[in-house]
Amino acid sequence: MNVAIVGATGYGGIQAVNLLKKNKNYKISFLGGNKTSGLKWNDNFPFIYLDNDPYIEEISVDNISKNADVALLCLPNGLSSTLTRKLLDKGLKVIDLSADYRYKSLDEWKKVYSKEAAIYKRNDDDLCKEAVYGLPEINKEAISKGRLIACPGCYPTSALIPLAPYLSQGIIENEGIVIDSKSGTSGGGREPNQKLLLSECGEGLSAYGLINHRHTSEIEQVASLISGTKIELLFTPHLVPISRGMHSTIYGRLRDPGLTSDDCRILLDNYYRNFKNIKVLPVDTFPSTKWVKNTNQILLSVKVDNRNGRIIILSVIDNLLKGQTGQAIQNLNIMSGFSMDEGLDLTNNFP
């Protein structure tokens, strides 16, 4: 199967090249990047050497579609929407890593991504409704039948997977959910950003986007669908001075305060027992981002505070893999009829 990587020179695109070049089921048919078009790949990315040393090409529908079956859109928010319908009309399947199709309502996207909405005059509410939210562990069947997949954000991935078992079965109350997340600097992308300079963020920890972070509404939308009722929650992201990795600590109120840590661990383990990339750790073993670095694995741990009937769930992912491109490849595998984890590392080279 031929895959076009559109936006190949950002962090998401670079991860896609690295993953697909090792996967016998796929052939990279196009590498797109407007700022670097006309340059040879190996000259710019010698650390991900490609035998045929292809040129990076200008991004256009004709260039993308001439040899591709699937397009991976690794583009900034808003830009993907300028290509998606045209690529679908050409018969390609589309996996979008941006936020353009994560919301079932275009109006909701315009509200949350107002800056992008002012630039990109979209009229594709039908595609927003059609797009499948690409969280493989939750939506595998729908993904297998879809032609447009909207990959989740990194923070939503780290929060929704640990929350889903407890929301879907009514184990926790719908009110009072708090998500405290930490992300490495690569989550900010590859474009220069003063806040991500080593001298600015090194040896420090800071919160950002309190209350109004864009991923809050995305988490709430999907959590509400899982639980069957409207959910509002608190989400606070933090920047930590590591290159990659994400850690989320999630707090909720148990409907049955008599449940123990072992009870909640068994429930979590049973829910994900058929997914090789999800590991539920023993009670009192708490995961580190270092344990999942450069893998598509997600590690989960749960603890109950029986003094107050609260549950604490921990999750760690590599934000560039399970939180981004690794998840896109999971979706590609499902759409193509392959094993979900085909070509994805589930163990890292510790330390």
UniProtKB/Swiss-Prot annotation:
Pathway: Amino-acid biosynthesis; L-arginine biosynthesis; N(2)-acetyl-L-ornithine from L-glutamate: step 3/4
Active-site feature positions: 154
UniProt GO MF annotations: N-acetyl-gamma-glutamyl-phosphate reductase activity; NAD binding; NADP+ binding
BP GO terms, sorted: L-arginine biosynthetic process
One of the record's GO cellular component terms: cytoplasm
Catalyzed reactions: N-acetyl-L-glutamate 5-semialdehyde + phosphate + NADP(+) = N-acetyl-L-glutamyl 5-phosphate + NADPH + H(+)
Pfam families linked to this entry: Semialdhyde_dh, Semialdhyde_dhC_1
Alphabetically ordered keywords of this record: Amino-acid biosynthesis, Arginine biosynthesis, Cytoplasm, NADP, Oxidoreductase
InterPro entries registered for this protein in UniProt: AGPR_AS (IPR023013), AGPR_type-1 (IPR000706), NAD(P)-bd_dom_sf (IPR036291), NAGSA_dehydrogenase (IPR050085), Semialdehyde_DH_NAD-bd (IPR000534)
Broad EC category: oxidoreductase
EC number: 1.2.1.38
Coiled-coil stretches: none
Subcellular location: Cytoplasm
Domain of life: Bacteria
Job description of the protein: Catalyzes the NADPH-dependent reduction of N-acetyl-5-glutamyl phosphate to yield N-acetyl-L-glutamate 5-semialdehyde.
Family per similarity comment: Belongs to the NAGSA dehydrogenase family. Type 1 subfamily.
PANTHER family referenced in this protein's UniProt entry, alphabetically: N-ACETYL-GAMMA-GLUTAMYL-PHOSPHATE REDUCTASE, CHLOROPLASTIC-RELATED, N-ACETYL-GAMMA-GLUTAMYL-PHOSPHATE REDUCTASE, CHLOROPLASTIC-RELATED-RELATED
Protein name, per record: N-acetyl-gamma-glutamyl-phosphate reductase
Organism of provenance: Prochlorococcus marinus (strain MIT 9301)
Gene name of this polypeptide: argC
